[in-house]
């Protein structure tokens, strides 16, 4: 019924644990709040069920300036995510003060393929690392009405690479021809 959101300090970083019913706007909301609080994302583990009840489990290693978030900030982030999911907190309005949401990402590459191991449609999104990148990617995914059910993240030499395993609208598998169109559409949405 209600989202489970916990933030714990682990060594020099904070770890956010999240569980809820998966919906296409979820990651947009979560990453929007993290961007609004100026948090850095170091790693992302995401597992989503592909059958009812379609729950998603997320573990994010995050920090503020490379350090553990103060307890008060962690509590505010937790509350903000909860309020955003309930529609009581407009994350876009808060972000518009911090970022130019219309400016694109630099050197965007997108590629669609069907993963032979997971047998799921996958989308590779790569761009130069910059604040708000995750939010912009997840916002574009939401605009396309896609559901992320697994994700891999790699940050290397100033580039961020996300591999997102997806279901299409109505939790359907995405055929190749449509996936290629989606990849192209995402690239346009995200580029300068």
Residue ranges and their predicted role:
Residues 1-192:
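Regulatory modules associated with amino-acid/nitrogen control
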